Curated annotation (Swiss-Prot):
Name listed for the protein in its UniProt record: Uracil-DNA glycosylase
Highest classification ranks of the organism: Bacteria, Bacillati, Bacillota, Bacilli, Lactobacillales
Family: Belongs to the uracil-DNA glycosylase (UDG) superfamily. UNG family.
CDD domains: UDG-F1-like
Organism: Lactococcus lactis subsp. cremoris (strain SK11)
Reaction catalyzed: Hydrolyzes single-stranded DNA or mismatched double-stranded DNA and polynucleotides, releasing free uracil
Compartment(s): Cytoplasm
Active site residues per record: 62 (proton acceptor)
Amino acid sequence: MKKTDWSQPLRNRLAEDYFPKMIEFINQTYQEGKIYPPENQIFRAIELTPLAQTKVIIVGQDPYPQPGKAQGLAFSYPATFKVNRPDSIVNIQKELREEGFSKEDSDLTAWAEQGVLLLNAVLTVPEFASNAHAGKIWEPLTDEIIKIASDDERPKVFILWGGFARKKAKLIDGSKHLILEAAHPSPLSASRGFFGSHPFSKTNDFLVQTGQSPIDWSK
């Protein structure tokens, strides 16, 4: 993990033995099998989006388990893959178009660079084994990242899609921040509350109202 302004708050909050256990978990799992994302991208979300620049937090579940697809950013998918994109990112693009934003590619790195923390609750996944690392090591860390963002003074937007992410609402101070909850953008649930929820325009409205620059979701 590269040193960022997330580092010290995390070390202050987590148990003293957490980081040695985390390093042991990473070393062991990456030696034993095919794990995604690449080891140098595990913490890419907090490396690309410092706490001081974080305006929006989108919570995902875990990385894509297929080779070459996970980028260390929730929902982001390499632009080099033009076909067979995950249905969730396709539906996110549909909602963006509905809200007047035109984003043709599925790589969300430019969002992260604008202050959108694309945080998976579980940061690693074995090949073709979605959610297999849930409950192993990551949730104490990612829950604290959410709490640190919530405790920060600047108002933020927390976007929680689906039942898994919505459970994180209890970690967030709703009196200070905007919490946007909706169905997950997967095909099973997108038509039951994701489409038409307008998370992107609502986020920008809140940012402008609180004196912050809006996100260019088309990037």
